[in-house]
C-alpha cells in the first residue's frame, strides 16, 4: 500500500455530518427520552442520514471506492429508546490518564481518558470509557452486533463537550457510525479499548451492509 491515510476519528466525517450528530445531543429535555417527539426525531434523523449518503456518493473525501454503484448506507430503524442518559464518572481534573489506542494499521494514537459513562440498555447495566481528543469527546465501542450486523472493528459516537452537564450526557446510539476503514482499507482507524465491549446488542445506528 503506497500511502496509508491516517485521520483522527473526529475528522472521519465532514463538518455537516458532525453538526448533525451534535444536534442529536442537543435535543430538549435530555433527562427523559420519552419527551422526544418520536415522529420528529425519526424524520430529522432520516434527513441527516440522507445527507450523509449524498456526501458518501459525491464528495471526493468519501471513503467509498466505487461511488458510481453506491446506493447508500444501511441503518437499524431509528429507535428513541437507544438514546440514553448516561451518568459520568470523570477522572480527576488535572490527573487524567493518557491511553494508547491501537489503529487498524498497527500504529498508535494517544487519547485522554475523560470519564466512565454508566447507563442501562434493555435493563442491563452498561459502562463505557469516554475518550477526549483535543476539544471533542468520543465513545469507541463494540457490542453483540459487532462482526455480524455491524462492523467488527467497532463503531463510534462523537459527543460535544458542551452537551455535558452535571456529570450527565445523552449517548444516542442511533448516531453510531462505522469508521472509514470499514469501507476503505487505505484508512487507519482507532480500535475500541478492550473495556468498551458492551454485553448487549445495540441495534441502533449504522450497520455494515451497503444497499
Language-model features: locations:
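Extracytoplasmic/periplasmic/luminal assembly and interaction segments
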Residues: 48, 59-99
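A mature extracytoplasmic/lumenal domain signature
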Residues: 88, 132-134, 143-145, 173-177, ...
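Mid-length scaffold segments of soluble, non-membrane domains
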Residues: 92-154
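Acidic, glycine-rich flexible loop segments
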Residues: 143-177
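Short, Lys/Arg-rich N-terminal segment immediately upstream of the first membrane anchor
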Residues: 1-6
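C-terminal partner/receptor-binding element of secreted or periplasmic proteins
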Residues: 184-211
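Hydrophobic membrane-insertion alpha-helices, especially the h-region
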Residues: 10-26
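Ser/Thr/Pro/Gly-rich low-complexity linker/stalk segments immediately outside membranes or between
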Residues: 28-43
